[in-house]
């Protein structure tokens, strides 16, 4: 298990305090308006953070987007708890979640050698590995030894790099500020409405 990766939307945002004061003042006449606007903006920011994290990691590593995205979890904000964060944790991923060739099953003594790449660089041979049903498998020893799945890095390891953290943190902050303006405008225009068009009370 790798150390968890976790980023809060407002940590490090110098512009947030002033924006929040403006939003609070603008929505002071609408009960629940301020908390609703902030909640929606926070949750949109954390969603964009996950998207940015996946893109930033895939700029450097060949890991598939699906397994990568599933390793991130968003703690959603509510009107009573105006906090949200983006986290990632998990064990090492199978090497088959990274780029490899060939894609078809390989069997027999004359099978094609398996090659894989973790970084966005050239493919390299993976010992005596073979491909079966889309998975890379390998034996450590004779045919009587159990099959193992060669592993690549875990997502927290991929995410806990300064360049990824900086991109995600700044992007989340920018999205929050932009969405806060939008949400305040929407509430001033239409009042408090749920996503299904119903009124929100509180």
Protein language model regions, located:
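Short, Lys/Arg-rich flexible segments
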Residues: 1-202
């Amino acid at each position: 298990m790798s150390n968890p990766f976790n980023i809060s939307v407002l940590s490090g945002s110098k512009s947030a305090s002033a924006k929040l004061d403006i939003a609070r003042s603008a929505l002071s006449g609408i009960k629940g308006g301020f908390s609703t606007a902030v909640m929606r903006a926070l949750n949109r920011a954390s969603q964009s953070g996950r998207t940015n994290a996946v893109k930033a990691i895939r700029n450097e590593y060949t890991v598939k987007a699906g397994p990568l995205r599933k390793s991130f979890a968003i703690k959603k904000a509510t009107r009573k708890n105006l906090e949200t964060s983006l986290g990632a944790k998990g064990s090492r991923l199978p090497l088959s979640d990274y780029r490899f060739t060939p894609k078809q099953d390989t069997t027999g003594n004359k099978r094609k050698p398996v090659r894989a790449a973790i970084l966005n660089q050239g493919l390299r041979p993976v010992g005596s590995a073979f491909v079966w049903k889309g998975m890379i498998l390998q034996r450590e020893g004779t045919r009587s030894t159990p099959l193992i799945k060669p592993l690549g890095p875990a997502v927290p390891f991929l995410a806990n790099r300064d360049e990824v953290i900086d991109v995600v943190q700044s992007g989340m902050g920018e999205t929050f500020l932009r969405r806060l303006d939008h949400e305040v405008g929407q509430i001033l225009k239409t009042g408090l409405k749920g996503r299904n068009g119903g009124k929100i009370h509180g």
